[in-house]
Amino acid sequence: MNNFNLHTPTRILFGKGAIAGLREQIPHDARVLITYGGGSVKKTGVLDQVLDALKGMDVLEFGGIEPNPAYETLMNAVKLVREQKVTFLLAVGGGSVLDGTKFIAAAANYPENIDPWHILQTGGKEIKSAIPMGCVLTLPATGSESNAGAVISRKTTGDKQAFHSAHVQPVFAVLDPVYTYTLPPRQVANGVVDAFVHTVEQYVTKPVDAKIQDRFAEGILLTLIEDGPKALKEPENYDVRANVMWAATQALNGLIGAGVPQDWATHMLGHELTAMHGLDHAQTLAIVLPALWNEKRDTKRAKLLQYAERVWNITEGSDDERIDAAIAATRNFFEQLGVPTHLSDYGLDGSSIPALLKKLEEHGMTQLGENHDITLDVSRRIYEAAR
């Protein structure tokens, strides 16, 4: 096991009616900006519950944050925060709203003579402070509710980049599984795929004898395999929704990634597909992951075989046959959730691969993976295999 420094300071308020504890998490004299997306939180009544919980407090609203939060939209919120002297941000929604709010939190305190896109260009390394934020989660997927990362898009340049900073880690997160009952099936399926791939990005790498982290990861994967499809069939099954919600949080709160090698190449290749073609984040992960595993089967051999046996109970055949079966089982799981796994399924013929590689190069994504050996040439082969 590698050395690690783990700090997970987000307070989690989990369960039915957890919103009741919201008010006491926010300073009583705060000027609060509630951020949300396209309006589903209004239709479902979640926003009304939040406003009721904060009745009597100084509250402003900012809606319209996109599924891939856009820098251009978020800068309008930054302007509002600065003008209105907002002192606390409350994100109400899924990972995109949370990620966008993290950017707002950091950008509002960024030096005014520097374009806040610099936050993405430097990966968040130069963030010195941020407005504190909390969240009310309505879509389990990204784990953004209890981590320090965010991904932001810039429409005008076709960029989608990530940043990390402890300054934007949510102070608290309200997780009520009931809020997920009304999610459209596509978002439920995407959330399961996202959480699944977050887990394997930290698990299917190379062995370092980290038994606790491995078994935590396997537990998350088995739970998603068991309850992910049930969440689609039984949308108001509280226990199923609770398990999926908690699995997504655990997949990316730092716990399973502590002391182990991490990959993240699937995410980097996927970000370029979203930025260029507008695919859902989870759709890009489902496209890239099986192709990447097939390409990197030799360097990932030990963990792919462990994954095959412990997650899919595949124990017969040669090493390569078991790896083939594990990749096929993963692809089949995504497909059964309704998330196709080839570029052609989305009407893409691969003609944009040179442009995708150019963007990877522009963003410095030329030595990806846990071994830093996924070069542009390897990325090209992965994209080609995903057609």
UniProtKB/Swiss-Prot annotation:
As cofactor, the record names: Zn(2+)
Could you say which enzyme class this protein belongs to? oxidoreductase
BP-aspect Gene Ontology terms: response to reactive oxygen species
Give the reaction(s) catalysed.
a primary alcohol + NADP(+) = an aldehyde + NADPH + H(+); butan-1-ol + NADP(+) = butanal + NADPH + H(+); 1-propanol + NADP(+) = propanal + NADPH + H(+); allyl alcohol + NADP(+) = acrolein + NADPH + H(+)
Cofactor note (record): Binds 1 zinc ion per subunit.
The annotated phenotype of a deletion mutant is: The deletion mutant shows increased sensitivity to reactive oxygen-generating compounds such as paraquat, potassium tellurite, chromate and hydrogen peroxide. The mutant shows increased level of lipid peroxidation products. Deletion of the gene leads to accumulation of isobutyraldehyde and a strong decrease in isobutanol production, suggesting that YqhD contributes significantly to the isobutyraldehyde reductase activity in E.coli. The mutant shows greater sensitivity to glyoxal but no difference in methylglyoxal sensitivity.
Keyword entries, A-Z: Metal-binding, NADP, Oxidoreductase, Zinc
**Subunit structure of this entry?**
Homodimer. The crystals contain two dimers in the asymmetric unit.
* Name used for this protein in its record: NADPH-dependent aldehyde reductase YqhD
Species assigned in the record: Escherichia coli (strain K12)
